[in-house]
Amino acid sequence: MTFSLFKEVIMMKKLALLATGFVCAGLLGACSSQGMATSNKDMGQQTAKAGDRQTSGKKVKDFNLQGVDGKTYRLSDYKGKKVYLKFCASWCSICLSTLEDTNELAKEEAGKDYVVLSVVAPTFNGEKSAADFKNWYQSLDYKDFPVLLDSKGELLKEYGIRSYPSALFINSDGTLSKSQIGFMNKEDILKTLENMQ
């Protein structure tokens, strides 16, 4: 192999490595959605308001949402139980990769002191329409936990949800125990639930 050919091969490998780095960086940011562009001042105000709403110990506002299954779900229906409320999106690779764990966690809830609920906001933050989401989700094999449709984006706004996955851990008395942004494995979710009131 000639020296110039060797240099060309090295250069091509460097370019491939650089391209791979850009793809990885894009994937890491894929599950972070900021919606429409806002000024830094507006974003700071939104973040501050979201932080105010997500204070541990604060009473969580009741909601009334329709599920993909057509049933109506209210937070108040679960009074006396701990609630793991997971916000996700169909385009979020992390959310999709954790569906099996979420489903298993929900299967295990029978006889336990907690319940698993998931929330999707159709047409918000790049999500499909409600009809398209229902068709897509019903083709999957995750039937052990309700998926609620926040069609007006009210919960997203109330809890300042801008990244997926995100979760709220709600105590059995209806107060917020913890909010979580990003991936959480099943074992950590269970530990959090066990340590709640």
Model-flagged regions — what are they?
Residues 62-83:
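A short beta-strand-turn-helix
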Residues 114-128, 144-151:
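Thiol-based oxidoreductase modules, predominantly thioredoxin-like and allied folds used
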Residues 169-197:
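Thiol-/selenol-based redox modules, centered on thioredoxin-like
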Residues 1-62, 197:
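N-terminal targeting signals for export/organelle localization
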Residues 133-170:
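Short, internal strand/loop/helix patches
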Residues 84-85, 116, 167:
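Hydrophobic beta-strand anchors of alpha/beta hydrolase catalytic cores
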